[in-house]
Curated annotation (Swiss-Prot):
Family annotation (Pfam families): GST_C_6, Tom37
Species assigned in the record: Schizosaccharomyces pombe (strain 972 / ATCC 24843)
InterPro entries for the chain: Glutathione-S-Trfase_C_sf (IPR036282), Metaxin_GST (IPR033468), Mito_Protein_Transport_Metaxin (IPR050931), Sam37/metaxin_N (IPR019564)
GO CC terms, sorted: cytoplasm; nucleus; SAM complex
Similarity annotation: Belongs to the metaxin family.
Region (Disordered): 355-407, 423-450
UniProt-listed SUPFAM superfamilies: GST C-terminal domain-like
Positions with biased composition (Basic and acidic residues): 374-383, 390-400
Keyword annotations: Cytoplasm, Membrane, Mitochondrion, Mitochondrion outer membrane, Nucleus, Protein transport, Transport
Keyword Cytoplasm: yes
Entry function: May be involved in transport of proteins into the mitochondrion.
Gene Ontology biological process terms in this record: mitochondrion organization; protein insertion into mitochondrial outer membrane
Protein's name in the database: Metaxin-like protein C409.19c
Length: 450
């Protein structure tokens, strides 16, 4: 069984959203009553587009009115049988209804602050449960302002100051502010009326004398006509209504067509919704948490969009570019000065390899020198040891060659002189200056020895 999820009723309509109303009317006319169930909800989190209407076929979710109509036609629930010319008209007027006609309603209902505060927000809050009654109206107003900023170029600051939002103490006493608010409101009404007359005139050209647009049977285009234009024609709660009088006086044929559809589909005698199973989707903590999370993510996306849309004056961009160029040039010149003067040396892998080879060569040379010194020292030590061994042998030979004989005192004495002469000859020692040896002393010495 198919399940269609739509917003709750309000503002004199079965549902307070034009897209939901179009899907509801089409399903009531095309789908058998035992094959579809209508669920009223404020939770749009189940929809792939996060907007209602949404359709669940038991396996997959379908979001947005356009996708729902295409899916139902593919399943065989088709109200249309157009030829080529009719199909071209349907596509053109469908685009007009979903575009300009819907923009006019959003402009009057959600952007006009007095209408929103006094009529639209209370109606939504009354139809929805907590916490949807606080979150959904403001979310719809935010979406409407974003859409109109793209389609009609209306900025938020153009409609943010209204007479209804003035403090009571200033509303009537401050004549200047009150006059400015009234002028803005009047200018917006003129703009809405001008755009509405053009749109209504184009739509009225398609209305014929037949009961429906293309004959005696309703089509998807009839559903769209009534869904989008009924809010213009039959909403009585707005304190500043501009679209309804404009439609009544400037396009009476179109207004009569809408009244005829209302009597055919929603009169007390023949209501196409009465056979349908319409229920209210139960709310639980999970759906409330999902809604809260969706609102948090929506605000985060809005903040991200506002940051990305931040515009910088051209003069400031030029200043930033100039400063950036000077900073880059200064940094480049400093780096070039440091590298060119050798203050910082950038080593590559080849340089590191060459340095390693040089270090290895130095180490090998040092090792060779150490080996040579150790070898020379070893040879020197060995030679000294051999010489030291030979010297005692020679001394022994010399000592053995001389026989010790007893010497007299005179021999000992003169032997000393002989040694002195030898020392004088070898070392050039001259003792001529010494005192002459006294012979008397020599005789005394001999006597003492004897």
């Amino acid at each position: 069984m198919l399940q269609l999820f739509i917003y709750s009723p309000g503002l004199g309509q079965p549902t307070m959203d034009p897209g939901c109303l179009a899907a509801l009317i089409y399903c009531a006319l095309a789908v058998p009553k035992d094959e579809i169930e209508i669920l009223r909800t404020a939770n749009s989190g189940m929809s792939p587009t996060h907007k209602l209407p949404a359709l669940w076929d038991g396996h997959v979710w379908i979001g947005s009115l356009k996708n729902i109509l295409i899916y139902l036609k593919q399943k065989g629930y088709n109200l249309d049988n157009f030829d080529a010319k009719q199909l071209a008209n349907v596509m053109a007027f469908t685009s007009l209804l979903e575009g300009s006609v819907n923009d006019l309603w959003l402009l009057e209902a959600f952007v006009n602050e007095e209408n929103f505060v006094e009529a639209i927000r209370p109606a939504w809050s009354k139809a929805l449960k907590f916490p949807h009654n606080y979150l959904t109206p403001n979310a719809l107003q935010r979406q409407a302002k974003e859409r109109l900023a793209q389609t009609l170029g209306i900025r938020d600051e153009e409609v943010s100051y209204e007479a209804s939002r003035m403090p009571i103490s200033h509303k009537w006493t401050n004549a200047t502010r009150h006059r400015q608010a009234l002028l803005r409101t009047q200018a917006r009404r003129i703009r809405i009326s001008s755009l509405a007359r053009q749109v209504y005139g184009s739509l009225e050209s398609l209305i014929s004398d037949s009961k429906f647009i293309f004959g005696e049977k309703p089509t998807s285009l009839d559903c769209l006509f009534y869904a989008y234009l009924s809010f213009h024609a039959f909403t009585n709660e707005l304190p500043q209504a501009t679209l309804r009088p404009c439609l009544q006086f400037n396009s009476p044929k179109l207004y009569a067509y809408l009244k005829s559809l209302r009597e055919t589909w929603f009169s007390d005698d023949s209501n196409i919704l009465s056979p349908l199973s319409i229920k209210v989707q139960p709310e639980n903590l999970l759906t409330i948490a999902r809604l809260a999370w969706n609102n948090v993510t929506a605000k985060a996306n809005d903040t991200r969009k506002s940051i990305t849309k931040f515009s910088v004056p051209p003069e400031r961009k030029l200043l930033w570019a100039r400063n950036g160029f000077f900073i880059f040039a200064s940094a480049f010149s400093f780096v070039w000065f440091v590298i060119s003067n050798g203050i910082v040396v950038i080593e590559t892998e080849d340089d590191e390899a060459s340095f390693e080879e040089v270090d290895d060569a130095k180490e090998s040379i040092q090792e060779k020198e150490i080996d040579e010194t150790t070898e020379s020292k070893a040879t020197h030590d060995s030679s000294e040891t051999s010489s030291s061994k030979e010297l005692p042998k020679e001394e022994e030979k010399e000592s053995s060659s001389f026989d010790l004989q007893p010497l007299s005192a005179q021999d000992l004495l003169f032997s000393g002189f002989a040694e002195d002469e030898i020392m004088d000859e070898e070392f050039g020692y001259d003792d001529d200056d010494d005192e002459e040896f006294d012979l008397d002393d020599l005789d005394d010495l001999e006597e003492e020895i004897v």
